[in-house]
Amino acid sequence: MPPPPTPRKEIVIQEDVSPSLERVKVFSWNVLCDKYATASTYGYTPTRALNWDYRKSCILEELRLRDADFLALQEVSTDAFKEDLSPALAQMDYKGVHWPKSRARTMSEKDALTVDGCAMFYKGSKYILLDKQLIEFASIAINRPDMKNQHDVFNRVMPKDNIAIICFLESRLTGARLILVNVHLTWDSALADVKVIQTGILMEHVTKLAEKYARWPAVKDKKMITVPGGDEGDPPPPPQAEPGPSQEYRSNTEIPLLVCGDFNSTEDSSVYELMSMGRVPPDHLELSNYHYGSFTRDGIEHPFSLRDAYAHIKGTAEELPFTNYTPGFADVIDYIWYSTNTLEVVDVLGPPDAAYLKRMPAFPNWHFPADHIQIMAEFVIKGRKEKKQQQQQQQQHAERESGSGSGTPRA
């Protein structure tokens, strides 16, 4: 076994962060489904390093080490979720949500277990799951009135059974709410149009769901919603702080939003443009030769102000050289997008050891159990205007009270 790399560092983006602001740490990783980890695809990887039992232990150790609030994992098969990840992560305070790709529904129960999909884990002692939704791109496209009769939908979008998961959560302690999205787009480089259509469908659903979530009722009796515990005989958990009331949001763009995953798209793609700019015009090179209803007639857009968390270190020595590292391809295709009006980046997980990479032409290997690397960012939830106004009013009121009651003569 070759010597290990030096550990990846967390790169501080903002040093002066108010301790009163709530922090959220988000981790995203395509873990390479066991079914795809074959010697024919990864002939350069030692056989034992490709073995699922070995890779699983490396993956779980990495998740334990990073200790994020949210884990967005792609290429997780149903059996890996049920048998391996959920039980082990439950010991680390995580609860999970998983859906396999759509093909699982057409298979026998046994075969369906090996189908990969997306898994989202969250710290059960810190967050309550209010809602979860599965987004199946092919079935949504084929049922859209403006798309269902178009050949390009049948021939290009429909055969790809990629999915996304949308979770709506609330902090037990502060009542702050978040929308967390985990997505895995199609990989085929010849299907750039399909990737941006999938992204358009995703953001359309995020927009509609966020409108619904802005009207979501407050959580009653938070104390009654159980916190995941250990085994019988374990010491009781420490007493919980008094939970705060559910926060209220006036519109869909006010709720903090995080969109993570394997987008299989580089920075020069229409997918990146749509996420970062909020719009892709109908005459975009990756769309102009196809017919996808209103998406190719009017363009694709979403109302959120999103930024790639790693954009903060672009052009610096700490810039990520890739997130996917194979002999034929090395580039950034995985992202953590965040809503800039509600969240600020505090730090991100830096690149792998550069000297080590010179010795290692590709992943997976003994130290990196998947062909993708992990990405992680920590955020603070921005203070809200009404809260600030409330605090200012309370302060002014207190000052007036102390001023009028002090007996100090006024000029």
Whereabouts are the PLM-identified features?
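Metal-dependent phosphoester-hydrolase catalytic domains
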Residues: M1-E15, K126, P159, F168, ...
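Structured beta-strand-rich core segments of catalytic domains in phosphoester-bond hydrolases
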Residues: P2-R23, F70-D193, G299-P303, I336, ...
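Acidic/histidine-rich helix-loop elements
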Residues: V31-D53, A138-V157
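Active-site metal-binding loops of divalent metal-dependent hydrolases
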Residues: V31, V76, L185, D262-F263, ...
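Active-site-proximal segments of metal-dependent phosphoesterases and phosphodiesterases across multiple
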Residues: L185-E204, K223-A241
